[in-house]
Amino acid sequence: MDDLTLLDLLECPVCFEKLDVTAKVLPCQHTFCKPCLQRIFKAHKELRCPECRTLVFCSIEALPANLLLVRLLDGVRSGHNSWRGGSFRRPRILTLQDNRKAKSSPRSLQASPFRLGPTVRIHMDGVPRAKALCNYRGKNPGDLKFNKGDVILLQRQLDENWYQGEINGVSGFFPASSVEVIKQLPQPPPLCRALYNFDLRDKDKSENQDCLTFLKDDVITVISRVDENWAEGKLGDKVGIFPILFVEPNLSARHLLEKSKGHQLSRTKHLSLMSSPSRGKATNTSTLRKSPGSRRKGSGQFAMTTALNTLNRMVHSPEGHQMVEISTPVLISSTSPSMLTQHGDRADFPASSAGQVSTSHPAPASPGHSTAMVSVPSSQQHLSTNMFVALHTYSAQGPEELDLKKGEGIRVLGKNQDGWLRGVSLVTGRTGIFPSDYVIPVFSSTARKTSSFPDSRHPTVCTTWALSTSSVSSQGSFSEGDPRQSGPFRSVFVPTAVNPPRSTSGPGTSGQGSLRKVRSSMRKNGSLQRPVQSGIPTFMVGSLRCSPAMVIRPQKFQFYQPQGMTPSPTPIMVEIGSKSISTGEPALTCINRGGKTRTHSAGNSIIMEGKETPIKSEPPPKPPASAPPSILVKPENSKNGIEKQVKTVRFQNYSPPPTKHSASGPTSGKHEQPATLKGSQPEAVSSEGEMTILFAHRSGCHSGQQTDLRRKSAFSKTTPPVSTASVSQTLFPSK
């Protein structure tokens, strides 16, 4: 084959012109002349391969030249034929025939391929190549075989441990540890592919003008890292910041993000310490202009960082540390990972749908952990499909696997194979596969099964993640039916270890009481925990969420004893009032036999019933006949300042157990006549007494009943309602 025939084969497939050294090879290994590529890019505003339609992400100038074409052209121009016997041989490769000719004729050295050595060496200086450190025979069919000392032309880098190269016209894969890289491959541009839609056109443009909007499968050029969860990138002619969890970076972009992570974090912390409370005045304009983190208008603008950090703090909270109460409402826009969809649907939500991240702590009798309630909008209910928590520690067995630590949060991206999942760690940010039996869904309904009390000596309370349509204003008012919110209320429970609370029963209590029923009729969508073990105080968790502006003060307890009366074993005073606070909710305060208080806040009513079986069967001592015990029921003053009449309740001897009463709402201002329970003969030993406290909401829509069976015989008397604003009925047993 002569030189003219060779030049006829070297033509561009598009324009059929002769190829020269300026021809560029695309990532799909197709070669075209530079003018054709420029015309394609100018016409379509993007560069795709004319044959296979593969999209090219880099510029035309950054494309490499075809090394084989360059060598062929150099050989033709120098007058040396590189084709011998119908087979192509690389320059600088000494064959056995050339070696014999070199020994027989010294002049043949001038015509041997080694005369091309200086020319080829000058060209090879810019070619990515590596030198073999050992013999490698390969284990798979696609592996490259070479000997120690061979020079391998590098084609591309698969990952940190594998290369694809060529030697003697044969291409294959080989490990990076078996070669020494002489000339590194040109690094591909740091690019990332969008996994989800990120569009903020419906939000406030003034706050989100620095965000880079994109759609799924868009390719973004990474410029730098802003902070732990945000990066700066370029898409077309637009430059802005975007959440890192929304994209999948390539190897170059991953190295760039990891390299600048520590520097950007330290820089952000330094700027946050130097920033003054008045952010309107830029004291250090040059520093803020250089920092990409200064583009964020405020700490509450992007809630994705806040949501992730809140989840990590709840997952990794130490057992001896109580959760901090978060009271500031956080705007959860579409930048939150909870807005992510599995199939790339557009995440369009109302601009005004805001959620309040708050924690509610009921006050137990003894110090310890309390129930935390975190509320987010109901539009993010699909967050339950991909949020998991590691149950056990797992060490990765391969490079594609993900290390897990107990309690670590993971966002699952999909199933890899049977028994394996693929996800990204919310702590390290790494992506990999892991066994499915090592994790549990955070927002799964099956987590409710774990919210039980395994032992009365080691009780636990449940952390409630409530997805509710209700809203609590900063003044603590409870509203419902907001048109901006929709979806049912649901709660999921995550067990949290707590310290055992003290027993609320006094020393005179014989036996343990079991709380049978705890119900809370708060509006329409209340959620309630039901204890399943005995001897455990009830922690009431409902749909009512109290903001820090709501203050619930326990009523003061006073001891009252009538004149000319022997001291009663348990003389107490109970005040039941619906104090007019900003929430419009009644506060029920009662005192136990041991003098310890329990305060509950209810939306409308609370019903508690308890039964206790006495150990001893002997009858209780009768109270003195001269002075029966009495209890003063003092109603609270209403809003208009009108004082209500103080009622005194006296006990009747040996009255039967009173039946349950329901306090109906007042319909008029007339006082009802008290219904006196007639006394009867004492029943057998099995008869039990009960103490009933009835109270009603101010509006009179609901009523509550609290029953505590502590003694065997009961003395009761009903008290009429004192006003239209409050209905109180107190029934107490004597000792």
From Swiss-Prot:
Record's GO cellular component terms: nucleoplasm; nucleus
Primary localization: nucleus
UniProt-annotated stretches for the region Disordered: 260-301, 335-373, 472-534, 612-637, 649-735
The EC number(s) this enzyme carries: 2.3.2.27
Biased composition (Polar residues): 273-289, 523-534, 715-735
Gene3D superfamilies on file: SH3 Domains, Zinc/RING finger domain, C3HC4 (zinc finger)
SUPFAM superfamilies in the record: RING/U-box, SH3-domain
GO molecular-function terms, A-Z: phosphatase binding; protein phosphatase 1 binding; protein phosphatase inhibitor activity; ubiquitin protein ligase activity; zinc ion binding
Parts of the chain that traverse the membrane: none
Single GO biological process annotation from the record: positive regulation of proteasomal ubiquitin-dependent protein catabolic process
PTM statement from Swiss-Prot or TrEMBL: Autoubiquitinated.
Domain SH3: 125-184, 187-252, 383-444
Regions of compositional bias (Pro residues) in chain numbering: 617-627
Region annotation Interaction with PAK4: where it falls in the sequence: 373-466
Domain notes for this protein: The RING finger domain is required for ubiquitin ligase activity and autoubiquitination.
SUBUNIT field: Interacts with FASLG and PPP1CA. Interacts with PAK4 and TNFRSF1A. Interacts with DLK1, MAP3K10, MAPK8IP1/JIP1, MAPK8IP2/JIP2 and MAPK8IP3/JIP3. Interacts with RAC1 (both active GTP- or inactive GDP-bound forms).
UniProt record similarity statement: Belongs to the SH3RF family.
Summary of the function given for this chain in its UniProt record: Has E3 ubiquitin-protein ligase activity. Acts as an anti-apoptotic regulator of the JNK pathway by ubiquitinating and promoting the degradation of SH3RF1, a scaffold protein that is required for pro-apoptotic JNK activation. Facilitates TNF-alpha-mediated recruitment of adapter proteins TRADD and RIPK1 to TNFRSF1A and regulates PAK4 protein stability via inhibition of its ubiquitin-mediated proteasomal degradation. Inhibits PPP1CA phosphatase activity.
Protein name (database record): E3 ubiquitin-protein ligase SH3RF2
Organism expressing this protein natively: Rattus norvegicus (Rat)
Native organism taxonomy: Eukaryota, Metazoa, Chordata, Craniata, Vertebrata
Gene name in the database record: Sh3rf2
